[in-house]
Regions:
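Small/polar beta-strand repeat architecture
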Residues: 68-144
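Contiguous segments within soluble domain cores/interaction surfaces
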Residues: 1-68, 142-197
Length: 197
């Protein structure tokens, strides 16, 4: 069984969907009238599996997960709008996209954000609003795979390198037909995902 095309798009507020064209290994299409049941078990590929790379992203980076490349600790965050993160010698540029986690005292500082570089040691989190006072902790990780959409939710206003990168997942399709015969195949699902930040 081969999946010829699979797409998954996740607009804000909607659920994922898949589109696929399926045929068996010999190219004989199994029609719906012949099928008693179809089951699909989807699971992620282990880190390090080989996948195709697009948009300039190297295969090693693609295989390491959604957030790759630079990362560093956070030593401060302002109680201001937008939130300004202190991270010495961060090396980021305006319009880069980061995932922030582990910041204590300001819950809104955690998440995925486009950033604006303030100086060599600080950057602001675009569209953020503080809801507390920084106490400690936090790390940020540079994201290569996220697109930032404008207020109209349609215009891409910024993205990391490789924002079109497809993710690879594996799935088991089990097709039972003619009551007694069952075909089970492991297939690769190349998934393209757009996430609003």
């Amino acid at each position: 069984m081969a999946i010829q095309q699979v797409d998954r798009y996740i607009p804000e507020g909607s659920t994922a969907f898949y589109r696929a064209s399926i045929s068996d290994e010999k190219g004989v299409r199994i029609s719906s009238s012949d099928i008693n049941s179809i089951t699909l078990t989807l699971y992620d590929v282990a880190s390090g599996s080989v996948i195709n790379s697009r948009d300039g992203q190297d295969v090693n980076g693609a295989n390491n997960g959604t957030y790759v490349s630079s990362n560093a600790g956070i030593t401060g965050a302002t109680n201001a709008d937008p939130i300004v993160i202190t991270s010495n010698a961060h090396g980021l540029s305006s319009k880069d996209i980061v995932n922030v986690s582990g910041v204590l005292g300001i819950p809104n500082a955690n998440g995925t954000f486009g950033i604006t570089k303030v100086d060599a040691n600080s950057f602001s989190l675009d569209r953020s609003a503080s809801n507390g006072t920084y106490t400690s902790g936090g790390t940020w990780t540079y994201s290569l795979f996220t697109m930032e959409l404008g207020a109209d939710d349609n215009t891409i206003v910024g993205s990391g390198v490789g924002a079109d990168q497809p993710e690879l997942h594996r799935a088991l399709f089990t097709v039972t037909y003619d009551t007694t015969r069952t075909i089970t195949h492991e297939v690769d699902l190349y998934v393209q995902q757009l996430t609003k930040v």
